[in-house]
């Protein structure tokens, strides 16, 4: 049986824990209970089959793998946000492409360099 897929919400939760410095602080920022934040991160680690955080005193610290995956998850969340923005713009009737009109007298070589 295939393992359940990790959700964007789980990545956002991990980011909040790291950015806020702990589970309680992340829960406050996310407007969720601390137990739901802890569960989301524990489930994420379980689904990935590796620890992303280790507890050092009262602070959650990223493991090496956690650090690598957190960086990539930030890109993923940013791309997902951009995709949602694009969908919203398309729904509003915005063009999905840019049209460039250039006078025939403009040197083609310059145009090609500028667009490269």
Which residues are covered by each model-predicted region?
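Residues within the DNA-recognition helix of helix-turn-helix
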Residues: 33-36, 40-43, 114
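Short alpha-helical "packing" element that flanks the helix-turn-helix/winged-helix DNA-binding module
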Residues: 10-17, 69
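Interdomain hinge and pocket-entrance segments immediately C-terminal to HTH DNA-binding domains
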Residues: 88-108
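Alpha-helical residues within the helix-turn-helix
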Residues: 28, 46, 67
């Amino acid at each position: 049986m295939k393992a359940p897929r990790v959700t964007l919400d789980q990545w956002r939760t991990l980011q909040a824990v790291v950015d806020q410095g702990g589970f309680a602080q992340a829960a406050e920022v996310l407007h969720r209970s601390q137990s739901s934040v802890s569960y989301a991160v524990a489930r994420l680690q379980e689904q990935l089959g590796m620890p992303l955080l280790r507890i050092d005193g009262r602070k959650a610290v990223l493991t090496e793998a956690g650090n690598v995956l957190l960086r990539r998850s930030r890109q993923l969340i940013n791309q997902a946000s951009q995709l949602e923005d694009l969908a919203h713009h398309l729904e509003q009737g915005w063009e999905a492409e840019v049209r460039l009109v250039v006078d025939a007298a403009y040197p083609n070589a310059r145009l090609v360099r500028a667009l490269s």
